[in-house]
Amino acid sequence: ARCGLLTGMHTGHAQIRANDEMTARGDVWNHEAMLRDSTLEGQAPLKAGTPTLGSVMRQGGYRTAMIGKWGVGGPATESTPNKMGFDEYFGCICQRQAHCYYPPFLWENDRRIYLDNELLPPGTPLDEGADPLDPHSYDKYTQQTYSPDIMYDRVLRFVNENRERPFFLMWTTPIPHSPMQAPDEMVQYYVEKFGDEAPIEGKGYFPSRWPHATYAAMITYFDRQVGGLVAELKRLGIWDDTIIVVTSDNGPASNSCSSTEWFQSAHPFRSGKGWVKSS
């Protein structure tokens, strides 16, 4: 889907058909190894020179940026945002790294920017003997720097720095993809609205004490960010000259973390990511 969105190619003609992790490189699912060796980051790359939204807009005279998840190439390939038409990039090159909202680092163009978070590999379970009903059992899954916060700061910075000229920004926020992680004050707001609920193990991601409340908090968080961006565009006097498109890269997905049925995410349709048919 990311390949199709970036290149405009129909899925049947797209270069990338799946999340190819290129496992021949080594133990790509070992996050400690990936922290030590950046060549293990990233997924199957686009071919060098492939036209993208970024390159086409840059040729048209726009300053281009991508902020967020890349996932179609890695630092050691010819398919990085900067090589694929984006003047500026900030975010997570590798989609596996995006499976934690408190990562130890992000990428700024071609270099890592280290954050004040410790590595906590996705799939890390609760401590042995921890009570899954005790909110404090989940404390280790919340760290210092919430990556959507600093991505959003870069969004506002880019808009401000380029307010006097044409710009194209592709903001590929990881929200609301699993795992379920959101600022606690927003989570508690929905805990009060929804009431108590069963925790989840978060298979392959992280456990969550309040998965429905956390998912709702993530949606609200992103909604507020979009509202803040609109307000900033108006403050800068460029709102009337700006086009905003909000889209998803796939249908609703639970990923064993949030309930698409409970939220009626595809309503009035059934199913979700992968296929949808009318009810």
What are these regions (language model features)?
Residues 1-279:
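Formylglycine-dependent sulfatase
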